[in-house]
A protein has these predicted regions:
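Conserved class I S-adenosyl-L-methionine
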Residues: 79-89
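S-adenosyl-L-methionine
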Residues: 106-159
Length: 267
C-alpha cells in the first residue's frame, strides 16, 4: 500500500501540518530510502525509510521543530512571555519562540559564536553565550522567566531543574528535551553513544519526571521529539509547569510514549 509523502510525514509525527510538510519537501530536505524527493504528492510505500535532513525548515535549526511539536501537543505558548532557551546553540528554540510571540528570549549556552546571526541581531534576544546555566541566578536577569525550554547535552536534567526553579515565575511553564544518552547510566549507553533499549527509555523518563516533581514542577505531558538526536538517538519532550501540587505522570504514560516513539522513528 502506498501513501502521499506529505501525508506520511504528518501521520508519522515527523512534521506537524501538511502545509509545512509540502514546504519542507519542496526545499529538498526530505529523503526516501536515501534518495531526495521534492514532490509532495510522491507516492511511497508505507514501510519506506523517510528522513528529514538539513535546516531549511522555517527555523534556524531543527530545535524549532521540537518546540513546534510541543506546542501542537501541549497547551502551552510563549506568546507575550519572557522566555529562556537553555542550551540555545544556533537558536532553533529561540527562533520558534519569537515566531510565536515571545516578547524576550534569554538564549543561554556554554558555547561561543553559535547563535544564528539573525537572532544575535534581534533586539528581543539576550545572548548569554559562554554561560553555564548552573551558574545563572535571578540577579543576572532583568526579570524572572515565564516560559523556558531545555535542550542540553552532557548534563542531566537533575542539575537543571534546581536552577530553573529559582529563576522562574510561580506559574512558569516549559518544555524539556529528555535525552536518554545523557540521562542513562554509562553501562546502558551503547555503541556511538546510542541508547536503543525501550526499557532504558522508560527508566529515563521516570527519573526525569522525578527531577521535575522534586523541584516544584508538575509534569503535564510527554511525547517524543519529531527528529532524532545525533547518532540516531530517540529523544522525548516533557511539558512541565510550576505548581503547588508538583508531581509526575503515571509510568504507563511514559510506556505508551516510548512504544509510540520506537514504532514511528525506528522504521
Amino acid at each position: 500500500m502506498k501513501i502521499r509523502l506529505d501525508q506520511y510525514l504528518v501521520q508519522h509525527g515527523l512534521i506537524q501540518s501538511r502545509e509545512r510538510a509540502k514546504a519542507m519537501i519542496m526545499s529538498g530536505v526530505v529523503f526516501v530510502n536515501e534518495q531526495k524527493v521534492d514532490k509532495a504528492g510522491e507516492m511511497i510505500k508505507e514501510d519506506a525509510k523517510v528522513e528529514v535532513r538539513g535546516h531549511d525548515i522555517g527555523y534556524v535549526s531543527r530545535g524549532g521543530l521540537k518546540l513546534e511539536k510541543a506546542m501542537q501537543c501541549f497547551p502551552l505558548t510563549p506568546k507575550g512571555k519572557v522566555c529562556m532557551d537553555i542550551g540555545a546553540s544556533t537558536g532553533g528554540f529561540t527562533d520558534c519562540m519569537l515566531q510565536n510571540g515571545a516578547v524576550k528570549v534569554y538564549a543561554v549556552d556554554v558555547g561561543y559564536g553559535q547563535l544564528a546571526w539573525s537572532l544575535r541581531t534581534d533586539e528581543r534576544v539576550v545572548n548569554m553565550e559562554r554561560t553555564n546555566i548552573r551558574n545563572v541566578t535571578l540577579d543576572q536577569l532583568a526579570e524572572p522567566i515565564e516560559f523556558f525550554s531545555v535542550d542540553v547535552s552532557f548534563i542531566s536534567l537533575h542539575h537543571i531543574f534546581p536552577v530553573v526553579q529559582a529563576i522562574t515565575t510561580p506559574d512558569a511553564m516549559g518544555v524539556c528535551l529528555v535525552k536518554p544518552q545523557f540521562e542513562a547510566g554509562r553501562e546502558k549507553v551503547g555503541k556511538n553513544g546510542v541508547v536503543r533499549d525501550p526499557a532504558t527509555h522508560r527508566e529515563v523518563l521516570h527519573n526525569a519526571m522525578g527531577y521535575a516533581a522534586a523541584n516544584g514542577f508538575k509534569v503535564c505531558g510527554l511525547d517524543f521529539s519529531p527528529v532524532k538526536g545525533p547518532e540516531g538517538n530517540i529523544e522525548y519532550l516533557m511539558f512541565v509547569q510550576k505548581s503547588d501540587e508538583p508531581g509526575a505522570l503515571d509510568d504507563s504514560v511514559a510506556e505508551q510514549v516510548v512504544a509510540s516513539s520506537h514504532s514511528t522513528l525506528d522504521r
